[in-house]
Amino acid sequence: MLLGKLIIMEFKFKQIPQEFEITEKIKQDNYLINGNLVKWDGEFSPVYSTISSTPEYKPTLLGEIPSLGKDEAIKALDSACNAFDKGKGLWPTMKVVDRINAMENFVEEMKQKRDIVVKLLMWEIGKNHTDSQKEFDRTVDYIYDTIEAYKKIDRDSAKFQKHSGINAHIRRGP
């Protein structure tokens, strides 16, 4: 309805389709330190959707995450620094084939969670179902493309290169 220069818009509540409803709240009650999931017994922060699922337009609670503090942040940072170990840690020195296997295993497990991740994308950032599916699939494709690029880098680095009459085998190191 138009009233002078003021536009008044009326919104009608529309029920969320059942297959997209949040039926179970997520409670993330652990966090990662030194490669281990540590149980969190402190306070939690609620995670709300930008989408309302009530006629009163109340926020939709999706779940809770740990309200980690400074001490946990320092432990996580120290853990990451120790794991990298200035380029001499397990991951940076791992054989290419083992890294690739780890990433392929990860992405295969990730694909098994597609439906829940797609639903959470819809609720957390307001994407529609089709766009959320595309976002997930693009991420999976990107991981596979990165693996293929890494394989190419490894193959190329195994070759001798000639420059100014000098043959060299150039490899990456820590």
Each language-model region and where it sits:
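Terminal low-complexity tails and localization/encapsulation signals of metabolic enzymes
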Residues: L2-I65, N101-N105, D137, K152-P174
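Glycine-rich loop-to-alpha-helix module at the N-terminal edge of alpha/beta enzyme cores
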Residues: S53-D154
